[in-house]
Design a protein with these regions (language model features):
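Juxta-kinase regulatory segment immediately upstream of eukaryotic protein kinase catalytic domains
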Residues: 1-19, 70
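Conserved ATP-binding subdomain of kinase catalytic cores across diverse folds
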Residues: 17-35, 39-156
Length: 156
């Protein structure tokens, strides 16, 4: 099964076996490494929880739209777009996700090195920095055309 999933992307090198990554509560997340003559590059592979997100196409359209928008904002302010927002790696068919033969849906992101994802606030400073990051995120999206977003969890 995993071979089918990995074959859906064009990898520039040899692909390691995906290993579980992080402590996510919704999607199943894996890290993998692609090694080539140019070196090693890490990626995040996620199995989308389609019990929660029943419209994976709409979900991925939202994610791609928002991250493309944020990437342009990052470029405009001189920030590194590779660190400023997630980057969805398209499949070999140029789709933002792959639906496997069993119906499961998978996506790949570039791994953003030297970052952390807190599962729980440990200090007031953690809470403050999380609030600052969320405020910046909201500010950057102020001009985003919200009417284009799909409702991915109805009545949530």
């Amino acid at each position: 099964m995993m071979n089918e999933i990995l074959a859906a992307w064009r990898w520039n090198g040899s692909v390691s076996e995906p290993v579980p990554y992080g402590e996510g509560h919704i999607n199943q997340t894996y890290a993998l490494t692609v090694t080539s003559a140019q070196g090693a590059k890490r990626y995040i592979l996620q199995k989308i929880n389609t019990d929660t997100f029943k419209d994976p196409a709409g979900l991925m359209e939202n994610i791609c739209g928002v991250t493309d928008f944020l990437r342009e904002k990052a470029k405009q302010r001189g920030a590194d777009p590779a660190r400023a927002t997630l980057h969805v790696v398209p499949t070999a068919a140029e789709k933002p996700y792959y639906q496997a033969a069993d119906g499961s849906c998978w996506r790949v992101y570039d791994f953003v090195e030297n970052t952390v994802c807190l599962q729980q606030v440990q200090s007031a400073e953690d809470f403050y920095q999380s609030a600052v990051a969320f405020g910046n995120f909201q500010h950057q999206l102020a001009a985003y055309p919200a009417h284009t977003l799909h409702e991915t969890i109805p009545h949530f």
